[in-house]
Amino acid sequence: MATYMANAKTVSPRWLLVNAEGKTLGRLASRIAAILRGKHKAEFTPHVDAGDFVVVINVDKLKITGNKTQDKQYHHHSGYPGGLKTINFADLQAKKPQRILELAIKGMLPKGPLGRQLYRKLKIYAGDQHPHQAQQPELIDL
């Protein structure tokens, strides 16, 4: 018997809703990355997008352990000399709380065309409101 290989026609994605209130950043990000990948399904195939859509709400209430609130820093570079920009966790959470979870999950996805396709299935919102009620996402507890 041949090994089963999923393809785009045989995979049917679901919409899942995750409430991030009080959850730890890294643990939540790794579970969401696995769901985006489709690793929780029996028909998981490494080179196929078999994952589900994930809507995350309340990311402004994420937890982080230790002193990382002040010590953890995020860097990006403009490409010009002296263009390194640095911001710590507390400041980034005040300005763009959804960016923290985006960066954590994006680092856990494959680098390449498949990873970019999976990343587009992730929807993150700071409050408890989201515009995806029409898709009827089912609430899961991670």
UniProtKB/Swiss-Prot annotation:
InterPro entries: Ribosomal_uL13 (IPR005822), Ribosomal_uL13_bac-type (IPR005823), Ribosomal_uL13_CS (IPR023563), Ribosomal_uL13_sf (IPR036899). Disulfide bonds: none annotated. GO terms for molecular function: mRNA binding; structural constituent of ribosome. Coiled coil: none annotated. One of its GO terms (biological process) is negative regulation of translation. Keywords: Ribonucleoprotein, Ribosomal protein. One of its GO terms (cellular component) is cytosolic large ribosomal subunit. Part of the 50S ribosomal subunit. Belongs to the universal ribosomal protein uL13 family. NCBIfam families: rplM_bact (TIGR01066). This protein is one of the early assembly proteins of the 50S ribosomal subunit, although it is not seen to bind rRNA by itself. It is important during the early stages of 50S assembly. This is Large ribosomal subunit protein uL13. It comes from Coxiella burnetii (strain CbuG_Q212) (Coxiella burnetii (strain Q212)). The lineage of its organism: Bacteria, Pseudomonadati, Pseudomonadota, Gammaproteobacteria, Legionellales.
